[in-house]
């Protein structure tokens, strides 16, 4: 009897009961804020920002005066160097740098240095302040972006244009040549003029030709010279009379 009861009551191996009792425990609540430590509470109370009370409304207060910033010592030094540059050099050209590489810039400096043309870099703010306070104020509109100054003690425009032809990243904007401002077209026209040495040679050859003619005329007979002088006087007198007649006709 007992054996049969035990067999009925005790669960068999591998048998799962139809209903099971599951115990649900209380969940831990973690959303409660921790209380602030009393020392931290004291520190927060002491360091709490208390806005000042205004004695007058904001509209009645006077506006703040902005302090004008003085030029730094570096700006003063660069300004002095720029002033000396305009005094010593006869040709100063302004060009814009359109992202030229460092290697190409080195080659350009080397080509310009062969013709005694120096490449100078100055901050735009310093350059504008100097130009606006000098006789070269008309050059200030050329100073914008990354600018480069090409300076030489003698005007060597043709050599400068030949050197810049290999670097299209350097765009020539204008130049001041012997205290005269030139645009890009003016620089091209100036480069087509003959050099000073050629002009001097032509002048000397013309003067020597005139002196040689004068010497050859002086070697002639005095009667021939007097006849030439009389003819010259007659031509001058006839020219003066024609001029007076034209003036009288215009006045009438």
Swiss-Prot record:
Q: Which GO BP terms apply? A: translation
> How is this protein annotated for GO cellular component?
mitochondrial large ribosomal subunit; ribonucleoprotein complex
Q: Where, subcellularly, is it found? A: Mitochondrion
Q: Which Gene3D superfamilies match?
A: 3.30.70.1730
- Which UniProt keyword terms apply here? Mitochondrion, Ribonucleoprotein, Ribosomal protein, Transit peptide
The record places the transit peptide at 1-24
Recorded GO MF terms: structural constituent of ribosome
Q: How does it assemble?
A: Component of the mitochondrial ribosome large subunit (39S) which comprises a 16S rRNA and about 50 distinct proteins.
Into which family does the record put it?
Belongs to the universal ribosomal protein uL10 family.
Q: What is this protein called?
A: Large ribosomal subunit protein uL10m
What species was this sequence derived from?
A: Danio rerio
What is the organism lineage in this UniProt record? Eukaryota, Metazoa, Chordata, Craniata, Vertebrata
